[in-house]
Structure formats: C-alpha cells, structure tokens
C-alpha cells in the first residue's frame, strides 16, 4: 500500500509513518521546510515539499496514493481563529477533495473536542460514545475544538453529499502523549523534572489520555478496512489514573517525585485567576487555558472506544503503564 501522510513530523504523524514502514508500506509525507523534509527522509519516507495551504503539493502527494492519513493540525496558537480555520478546516477540505478525486481512502485524525469539552466535562458525562453528537456548546474562544468540529463536518459533506464520494474514517483521540510530543508531554516533563507534581483531588481518576503509538495502530486498522466508514473514538487504550501517570512519567525521567494533592475547590478559582493573568500578559492567548487543564486533570475519562474495538478491530499495541514510562524515558534521553 502507498500512503500519503500529512503532519508527518508531528506526534501522531511520526508514529503513523513508523508503523507503516515497519510493515512494509510505501510512505510519502508532506514537509513544510528543509528541516521537516530531512526528518521525513530520516524516518525512511519520501518527503513532498509544501505546507497545508499548498494545494498543488497536497494534490501531488495524494496522486498515486492508495490512502491518506491526515494528521496535520494546529493544536495551540495565539494567532486567532483565521489561522485555525486556514490550517485545520480549509486544509482538511483540500486533503479530502484530493482524496475523493484520486480515489484514495482518507483517515482523518479528528479529536474528541468535536463533542464540546464544556459539555463532556462540566456536565459530568460518562460513557461518551459516537452517538453523543457534535452539536453541543464549545468554550468561547476554543478555536481548536471549533476547527476540529468544522473540519470533520467538511469530511462528512464530501463523503455523503458530494461527487465523487469520499471513503473516509475520522478517528477521535483524546489528549495524546508520546515520544516527540511538543504539546502535552513536553510540558509534563518540564514540570516533573523539578521533582514535584500536582494532582487535582486525590489523583485516583482515570485520565483522558491515549498513547500516540496506539492512535497510529488505529489509523492502520482503518486503512486495512476500506469497507468501514464513520467516526470512531480512540480515547481509551487502558486506564491510567492521574497520579499513576505522573509517577510513571517521573519514573521514566529518572526523577524522585513528590506529589502534591490540590483540592478541587481550590484548583478552579486558582485556574480562573491564572487565565486572567495570562490574557493580560499575552493578548490572544486561549481564554480558558488553565481552567481547561483543571477540567482535564480533575475529571475521569468519559470517553469509550468500544466501536473502534468492534468495527475496526483496534487493539492498543502498548499498555498505558509501559507507554507513559517510555515517554518519560524519551524526554530524559532527549534532554
């Protein structure tokens, strides 16, 4: 199989490329710079120069491919909605249209953010599966969630309403961690290297996290089942509690960790105050960054992935305990 990957130097993209090459597939990947192209080539894939706004480059990458894994996305940026729309929504439309035109299967890396993080966490929801719907409120200023929802809607328009019809699967991971992560894991590593970690409450709640290698395994499962279409949660690859995540990550880092438990009733007002300070100091910063972090840390994982296990036959390849320690070791060695 020949597969074109976007976001090939990002967290999920790197794991997808590695998994594809390990089983003998041919891989090309979009590379927006000489450095990115060298990184793609270093992994054993063939770089296609261009970024997510470069329509001819995307067309060239998709042409001749049997399938596309679209993993490129802006997760956190201070550049405003237009930047999110251009990179996450318009670019997804371009990739999906090219895939439909050239008859390539599309695996779109979406997010559980499409459900509306305010509803799933604030509402105390449990067992959020794909029937939950994507019409619930989104935090004001949560450009990432809005853009991922609109991007996925664009995929379904092309799959169900436009010609030629697109063969597509959307994978909805929760917070992704793993080796090479420049978003979440790198921040965890920076904090834990100090030898002190913080948990909200007693830390016994299962976190909404998934290992990048297990997301890649889901992408390959979707590629191998071209008759299956639709959206799938990839948000539960085994339970790992808030406290266990911190302790195992620190173990991988080689750090003796002291864990501080912060009561929930103190964490929320502190996060609200921190958001106010952040917005004053850095105009354009996400409106609810610290409150979103408290929600994520302090609530149990509400998402279930049984549909992916059943229809895609997705099986996580690395258990969480090993994956967290492996991630910590990577950041230890990369320091």
Model-found features: residue ranges?
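NAD(P)H-binding glycine-rich loop region in Rossmannoid oxidoreductase-like domains
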Residues: 35-41, 45-93, 98-100, 116
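Substrate-positioning beta->alpha
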Residues: 150-151, 182-187, 200-223, 229-230
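Flexible, glycine-rich beta-alpha linker
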Residues: 115-116, 166-187
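Conserved Rossmann-fold NAD(P)-dependent oxidoreductase catalytic core, especially the SDR/UDP-sugar
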Residues: 93-144
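Glycine-rich Rossmann NAD(P)(H)-binding loop
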Residues: 178, 200-205, 232-240, 250-253, ...
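Mid/C-terminal beta-alpha module of Rossmann-like enzyme folds, strongest
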Residues: 222-287, 305, 321, 325-328, ...
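Active-site Tyr-X1-5-Lys
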Residues: 139-169
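N-terminal Rossmann NAD(P)H-binding glycine-rich loop of SDR-like oxidoreductase domains
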Residues: 3-23
